[in-house]
Amino acid sequence: MAAPVDLELKKAFAELQAKMVDTQQKVKLADLQIEQLSRVKKHANLTHGEITSLPESTRMFEGAGRMFILQSKGEISNQLLEKQKTADDKIKELEQKKTYLERSVKDAEDNIREMLMSRRAQ
């Protein structure tokens, strides 16, 4: 009778360990992506701040591969604001994903603890 219980617990622990390793990797990846997006947002914010102090008649060029494209100050400003907004949205999405992953691991741990307690009670 004890052998099936032990096998069941071993299987549950193995699944939890695999899930935790996978989740920890995903959380680290999400942290790296959040960090990178924060740098992109900060760069766009600083660039936008510098551009706003320039007069409207200033010629501005956007880098596109090996060439530069002449654009108006308004277009570049709009692109930078859009880049900031996109980075903000992605950061929020990654934070939610990270929270979900951490919660799912905690739930799995709680389930195994509950299983252990019920086995000990028997």
Curated annotation (Swiss-Prot):
Keywords: Chaperone. Binds specifically to cytosolic chaperonin (c-CPN) and transfers target proteins to it. Binds to nascent polypeptide chain and promotes folding in an environment in which there are many competing pathways for nonnative proteins. InterPro entries: PFD_beta-like, Prefoldin. This is Prefoldin subunit 1. Pfam families: Prefoldin_2. One of its GO terms (cellular component) is cytoplasm. The lineage of its organism: Eukaryota, Metazoa, Chordata, Craniata, Vertebrata. Belongs to the prefoldin subunit beta family. The keyword Chaperone applies. Heterohexamer of two PFD-alpha type and four PFD-beta type subunits. Transmembrane segments: none annotated. GO terms for molecular function: protein folding chaperone; unfolded protein binding. PANTHER family: PREFOLDIN SUBUNIT 1, PREFOLDIN SUBUNIT 1-RELATED. GO terms for biological process: protein folding.
